């Protein structure tokens, strides 16, 4: 199969939404029956985002094969059906690390290692490898044109375009077209300068996607086309919208997919966007509204919980409910008390690392249990629910996780030292293992017990969900907690690790060690989140069974 490439770059400012624009175009091309994939090239020196602070970088998105990747891969999976893998995201740090490892082995036979050709060749090899087997690959380069870090990546895609030829490669560049209220017009000069910067690297954009808070007038688009050396119909106006799921229709209405197919000589049927039309309709016509409290420690940057936020919205679509997310700092729960949780229709405690704010999360789980408020715990959210139950119901005074308190008499959560991965291999870890890439990662099989809430929601005895954690329920203390009434409703493939817990004495209290948010999509939703939001609506209306 011959693969065609669309290289996506950004200029003027960062955070323009390259990932959303690229994913939207990919969704249209997929709707035309083409096999599409996407890649994200990150210019930072970290080997992967796994050890980066969520408040700096946003969430770490985990792929099925266990790669810790950029949050843009979450957007990709929510827009297209192709599942991302470790081949769909790599960083400058990963490239340099691999090149240096080869140099140490002597693979370069004593050559002087340079950015060109060694680093650029490595980037090109990874792009070609990751795109193999698809009709079209959209390759997004992180950062902004002109950044010193992105130069090797820009050079690599320039070389690739030359090697592939015009009939197999094209460039899509996103820029900002600001509106000046004093002048009463949009300004194209930043876009012109951004393209000029791109041209200085040797790249001529074929499509310009212009971000603005309004539609860009026809005369301004003509001006951009003239000065930036692109066809007028290739200047795409991408105005601000109230939902990212409207972007595919916005791009298609301007014939962007037709431009791509014409350039690559592809004959494909018209795109069927009926699924996206349904998503937009559901989003615009809710029958009610619920407020869900997200109790976390990274709330100053909502992108730290990007997939959870989106999964809640998707669940809202499935229930025809508008979901308002109220971010609650877990430290506020500690310092101000559980009063900050009053008035919520449901409580969600997401994943996290470190002991800051943990007691606040434990209090949130206790509040939800005692007041019969719907509760969904994810990863650490399951662990704090277990700790709270052990302390206050099983009467295991001072119960805790060994991650936060090594002196506890009841370490109900402890480090996993050995487990079987998705491929059946046994993985081992110790307290002294590196932090990076040493967790239980990726999609794992889970057995659900019949007659439980989890089984009812999923409608299946076996499921696959993605993991990212080092700590698990301590099986030595598990019988004591179960005896006190907590139900273990999900177990790992080898039935040695606890994956899902429930409180049978509560109308809706479910917590999972895995991350269900990573597999939720706007078109399909996710059963766990759909059930949770439904319960929130019933709780609000006083219909939730006590």
Swiss-Prot record:
Highest taxon, organism lineage: Bacteria
Keyword Magnesium: yes
Entry keywords, A to Z: ATP-binding, Glutamine amidotransferase, Ligase, Magnesium, Metal-binding, Nucleotide-binding, Pyrimidine biosynthesis
SUPFAM superfamilies: Class I glutamine amidotransferase-like (SSF52317), P-loop containing nucleoside triphosphate hydrolases (SSF52540)
A Pfam family recorded for this sequence: CTP_synth_N
EC number(s) on file: 6.3.4.2
Cellular component per GO, a single term: cytosol
Region span, Amidoligase domain: 1-266
Positions with a binding annotation for CTP: 14, 147-149, 187-192, 223
Family, as annotated: Belongs to the CTP synthase family.
Subunit organization: Homotetramer.
Function: Catalyzes the ATP-dependent amination of UTP to CTP with either L-glutamine or ammonia as the source of nitrogen. Regulates intracellular CTP levels through interactions with the four ribonucleotide triphosphates.
HAMAP family linked to this entry: PyrG
Protein name, UniProt field: CTP synthase
Phylogenetic lineage: Bacteria, Pseudomonadati, Pseudomonadota, Gammaproteobacteria, Vibrionales
């Amino acid at each position: 199969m011959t693969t065609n490439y669309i290289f996506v770059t950004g200029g003027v400012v960062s955070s323009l939404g390259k990932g959303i624009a690229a994913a939207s175009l990919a969704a249209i091309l997929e709707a035309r029956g083409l096999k599409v994939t996407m890649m994200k090239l990150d210019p930072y020196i970290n080997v992967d985002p796994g050890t980066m602070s969520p408040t700096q970088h946003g969430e770490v998105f985990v792929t099925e094969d266990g790669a810790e990747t950029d949050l843009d891969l979450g957007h990709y999976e929510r827009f297209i059906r192709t599942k991302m893998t470790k081949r769909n995201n790599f960083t400058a740090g990963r490239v340099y690390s691999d090149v240096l490892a080869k140099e140490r082995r002597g693979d370069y036979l004593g050559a002087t290692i340079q950015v060109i050709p060694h680093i650029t060749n490595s980037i090109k090899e990874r792009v070609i490898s990751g795109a193999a087997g698809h009709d079209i690959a959209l390759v997004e380069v992180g950062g902004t044109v002109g950044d010193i870090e992105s130069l090797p990546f820009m050079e690599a895609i320039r070389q690739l375009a030359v090697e592939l030829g015009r009939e197999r490669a094209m460039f899509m560049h996103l820029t900002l077209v600001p509106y000046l209220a004093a002048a009463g017009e949009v300004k194209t000069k930043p876009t012109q300068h951004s393209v000029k910067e791109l041209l200085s690297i040797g790249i001529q954009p074929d499509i310009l996607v212009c971000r603005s808070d309004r539609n860009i007038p026809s005369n301004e688009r003509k001006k951009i086309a003239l000065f930036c050396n692109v066809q007028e119909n290739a200047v795409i106006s991408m105005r601000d919208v109230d939902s990212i799921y409207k972007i595919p229709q916005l791009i298609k209405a301007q014939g962007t997919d037709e431009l791509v197919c014409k350039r690559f000589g592809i004959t494909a049927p018209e795109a069927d966007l009926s699924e996206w039309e349904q998503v937009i309709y559901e989003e615009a016509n809710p029958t009610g509204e619920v407020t869900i409290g997200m109790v976390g420690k990274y709330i100053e940057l909502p992108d730290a919980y990007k997939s959870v936020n989106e999964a809640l919205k998707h669940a809202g679509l499935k229930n025809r409910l508008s979901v308002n997310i109220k971010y609650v700092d877990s430290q506020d729960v500690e310092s101000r008390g559980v009063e900050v949780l009053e008035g919520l229709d449901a409580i969600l405690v997401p994943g996290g690392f470190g002991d800051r704010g943990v007691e606040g999360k434990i209090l949130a789980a206790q509040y939800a249990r005692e007041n019969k408020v719907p509760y969904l715990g994810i990863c650490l959210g399951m662990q704090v629910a277990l700790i709270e139950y052990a302390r206050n119901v099983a009467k295991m005074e001072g119960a805790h996780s060994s991650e936060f308190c090594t002196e506890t008499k009841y370490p109900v959560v402890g480090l996993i030292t050995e487990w079987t991965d998705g491929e059946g291999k046994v993985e081992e870890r110790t307290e002294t293992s590196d932090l990076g890439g040493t967790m239980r990662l990726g999609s794992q099989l889970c057995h659900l017990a019949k007659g439980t809430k989890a089984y009812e929601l999923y409608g299946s005895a076996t499921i696959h969900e993605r993991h990212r954690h080092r700590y698990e329920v301590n099986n030595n203390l598990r019988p004591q907690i179960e005896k006190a009434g907590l139900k273990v409703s999900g177990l790992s493939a080898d039935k040695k690790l606890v994956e899902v817990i429930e409180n049978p004495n509560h109308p809706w209290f479910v917590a999972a060690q895995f991350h269900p948010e990573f597999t939720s999509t706007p078109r399909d939703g996710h059963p766990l989140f759909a059930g949770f939001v439904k319960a929130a609506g019933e709780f609000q209306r006083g219909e939730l069974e006590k």
